[in-house]
Structures are given as C-alpha cells and as structure tokens.
Amino acid sequence: MVKDLLTPDYIFEASWEVCNKVGGIYTVLSTRANTLQTAFRDKLFFIGPDVWQGKDNPLFIESDNLCAAWKEHACEKDNLSVRVGRWNIPGNPIVILVDFQSFFAEKNEIYTEMWNRFQVDSLHAYGDYDEASMFSYAAGKVVESFYRYNLTENDKAVYQAHEWMTGLGALYLQTAVPEIATIFTTHATSIGRSIAGNNKPLYDYLFAYNGDQMAGELNMQSKHSIEKQTAHYVDCFTTVSEITNNECKELLDKAADVVLMNGFEDDFVPKGSTFTGKRKRARSVMLNVANKLL
C-alpha cells in the first residue's frame, strides 16, 4: 500500500528499448516521456544500449555539450564508453547510450558476483541473455559514475529498470550505491510469455503453475531467475496492470509493491480527420499484405 508520495530529484530509467524501437515498451516509455520531462526537466535521464554504432540512429540526437565534463570523467577514470544526447520524441529527454561490449571480458566474474549476492542463476544462459545482462550491468555502472561525479547523498535519486533485461544493473546498484532507490518494473513476466508462446493456457491455469518448475521445463531458467531475484531484492517492485500482477504473484512468488498503470499522452491517438485518414491507410496496407498471402 502506498502511504506517502515522495518526489525524487533525479530519475534514471533504463531499458533495452531506449532509442531502440523493438516493441511495446518503446511505446510505453516514449509516450509518457513528455509528461516526465515537463515535471523534471533535465534531471530525467533515459539509459539505453548503444547498438547503432557506426550507423545513423534517427531516434538519437547526439550532443557534445550535454554532461561533457562527466562524460570525459566516465571515459578516463571509470573506463565507460557512453554517448549523450536527446531522444527524438516529444519532450526530447536526455539519453545516455551505453557501449557495453567491454564488459563481456568480465562476464564470468559478473555472473559469479550476482550468484553470490543475489542467487541469480546465469548458468543456463543462451540467446540474448548475455547481451542484455552486459548492457544492464554497464547501465548500473554508468549511473554509479554519474551519481558519484554529479550528485551528493542529499540528492534523492531513483533508478527504474524495465524488464528482466535491466535487472542486473538494478541489483548492482543495490550494493554499489544503496543511496539510489531502485525500482524494477515488469510489463509481463518472461515465463508467462514463454508459457503462452508454447501454446499453453496461461490464465486458465495460472493458479496451478509454478514459475521455477515451468522455467526448467521451457528452458527459461536464467531469464526467470534474474527477473524473480530482481523483483525480490529491489527497493520497489512494480508492474503495469492487475492482470500482470496476478502473473507476478503466481510465477515470481512476489506481488508488486505498487501497480503502475500504463498511460500515454492525450494526443497519442489522432483525432478527427487525421485519425480517419491514418486508419484508412493502415487498413489498405493490411489488406494489401493479406492479399499477397492468399
């Protein structure tokens, strides 16, 4: 239950989909950024992976002036490679893109630390687990560096990590910079997605599923582990609806501390003739694709 509403001085939000349009989380973050930017101005920082190296990213507007002194310090003193600029969306919030490639050399040591401190099982990792985890850990190191260089213990800072891909960074900050409050937000559980993706009835039998057992059955142990352990160890665990909260209770053995309902700006859905025109064009495209599949 929420007893008090406290306003932080600084907000750091980490996601694999910052300046990297992949799916629904990009929409969630980008369509509320304007409201956050209005409230917090340039004390709001989004952190994403620098996966467009050597290519022009239309979603990222790089700046040589933003955080210039810290960026130089992060490179020379903390061995971190970052690019700073603005997200090319309404509100234009500050973005820090992180090059995480150098952390692969420390992967085994990082995973060992996470097992010893938080019992995160990375032994069964495959696919995108390593890449996401190295980004997540690097994002945590970046926030630590920024905090040590620019802020003091009197500054109230929050780190919000979205989805299992950013869990490692949140756990790192729990011990490295406990002054920063950590929030972990799941938009749908990884094991829930896997259950549904394997054509099993998720919600009809949700009460009967054991998350750990299903993770083993579906070869999802590591992703499930980082998600579950992050949910249990961060300062505040949140999800985006009562439906996903039911997933969390059953599959992660942890109900959300707060349910943060998804929201978007009033102008997200076009109005009037603009909406009608876009609807017609979208329908035409869908019919064209469907006809080609016949």
Question: Predicted regions: what is each one?
Answer:
Residues M1-L294:
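Catalytic cores of nucleotide-sugar-dependent glycosyltransferases that transfer UDP/GDP/TDP-activated
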